[in-house]
From Swiss-Prot:
Keyword ATP-binding attached: no
Renumbered residue ranges of the record's region Disordered: 333-361, 374-396
Annotated ranges, domain UBX: 186-264
UniProt key word Phosphoprotein: yes
Residues the record lists as Phosphoserine modifications: S369
Organism encoding this protein: Saccharomyces cerevisiae (strain ATCC 204508 / S288c)
Polar residues composition bias: residue spans: 382-396
Pfam families: UBX, UBX7_N
Keywords from the UniProt entry: Phosphoprotein, Ubl conjugation pathway
Coiled-coil region: none
Gene3D superfamilies: Phosphatidylinositol 3-kinase Catalytic Subunit, Chain A, domain 1
Name this protein carries in UniProt: UBX domain-containing protein 6
Function: Involved in CDC48-dependent protein degradation through the ubiquitin/proteasome pathway.
Length: 396
């Protein structure tokens, strides 16, 4: 009799509207076969074993089979039948105990309690996660409020005329390596130029910082460039074209240290700007006199005719095997000798890509003063530069 009164007092025939706001609340729906028929539930259900928390936190609903509410419930959950008891949470069916599907070995009450525990565990986990997220939210909110108060305090003190100005000690960041000293050391020792030729080749070489730019032009003309087209040096960063007056300056004066890239810009034969610059510049006349003296072709030495050197841009008629290789040692064009004076050429340990016969002699001199230029070969219509070198017999 106690159990009957407990079941009748536990389940509600209609859902109270006050419970509609509890979307996450656990709902237990009991579907009876007929009105007032609780015989199936009395066989196993033990309302006295429920705790007060389960009684208060769970919404207990009873539906009669065939009623409008029961038909609506079955349309949402077609698997439910009469008699049955169903556990819902968040609109999902978590556990269902059907009266006709239970076996004798299966205890309905144990199944019901296990279903409630699994649902409550999920609720506890969600509550913990929600509490943690809420704590984090509150912490961030407090930090924002404190930051606002701090900025407000600083702003008020700044506008206060009676407030004494506070001197802040500026922090200086020091490093073990001084950039200026390192830059000065690199600038005093070498200047690496990367030269981009009009034919697509890119070569690089290292020069002393006091080398004039016209010496770089001479080194380039005698070693790499033989197109015959006049050209000027163009600097990409900053975008500037170096004139003939600039070529009388050193690499250090042109701010090309420690490394820079120069692009060769070919000029057309009828370029008026180039012709006007050549005719009107007094410095160019001096430069032309100097270059005409250096560019005079000496006579061909028979002892040096064994080493053939093909420069870039020439028309080679024969099919000689030329390969792009790196030399083990190159010379640099210099305006200062080993002692800091004179006009001698100082050897360099840096290597530069060079095009030369694959079976040629490994010894190669790059200094302009040591180059012997042969005349054009009329038989093969091939322009070949022959480099002079010192053989073992001592002949030049």
């Amino acid at each position: 009799m106690y159990e009957m009164s407990g079941i009748d007092s536990l389940f509600h025939d209609r859902v109270v509207h006050d419970y509609s706001h509890t979307s996450e609340q656990v709902i237990v729906v009991y579907i009876s076969s007929a009105a007032g028929d609780n015989s199936w539930l009395h066989q196993w259900f033990k309302p006295g074993n429920l705790s007060d928390e389960e009684r208060e936190n769970i919404l207990w609903v009873r539906l009669v089979n065939g009623t409008k509410e029961c038909l609506l419930f079955k349309s949402i959950f077609p698997s439910s039948s009469a008699p049955s008891i169903n556990i819902l949470q968040n609109g999902l069916l978590e556990c269902s105990i059907q009266g006709n599907s239970l076996s004798r070995e299966q205890d309905p009450w144990e199944t019901f309690i296990n279903g409630l525990q699994s649902v409550f565990k999920g609720q506890v986990t969600k509550r913990k996660l929600f509490s943690k997220s809420n704590e984090e939210y509150q912490r961030v909110k407090r930090m924002i409020q404190n930051d606002k108060l701090e900025r407000k305090y600083v702003f008020q003190n700044t506008n206060d005329p009676q407030r004494k100005p506070q001197k802040w000690k500026q922090l200086t960041v020091t490093d073990n390596v001084s950039y200026k000293s390192q830059k000065g050391f690199l600038a005093q020792n070498y200047c690496t130029l990367q030269l981009k030729l009009p034919n697509g080749y890119t070569i690089s070489n290292t020069f002393p910082p006091q080398t004039k730019l016209h010496k770089v032009r001479m080194w380039l003309d005698y070693n790499c460039y033989d197109d015959g087209t006049p050209y000027l040096f163009h600097r990409n960063i900053p975008r500037v074209t170096l004139t003939r007056n600039d070529e009388l300056k050193s690499l250090q004066e042109l701010d090309l240290l420690p490394r820079s890239t120069l692009i060769l810009e070919p000029l057309e034969a009828n370029n008026k700007t180039f012709d006007y610059m050549e005719q009107s510049s007094l410095l160019h006349k001096v430069y032309s006199g100097l270059t005409s003296f250096w560019a005079k072709e000496p006579e061909v030495d028979a002892s040096s005719s064994r080493l053939g050197y093909q420069r870039l841009g020439t028309n080679v008629s024969n099919s000689a095997n030329y390969s792009l290789q790196k030399l083990s040692s190159l010379d640099m064009v210099s305006d200062g000798g080993g002692g800091g004076g004179g006009d001698s050429m100082t050897p360099s340990a840096y290597t530069t890509p060079r095009m030369y016969p694959s079976n040629g002699t490994s010894q190669l001199r790059q200094n302009v003063s040591e180059l012997n230029l042969s005349s054009n070969n009329s038989a093969s219509n091939t322009k070949v530069r022959t480099l002079g070198y010192s053989n073992n017999n001592g002949n030049n």
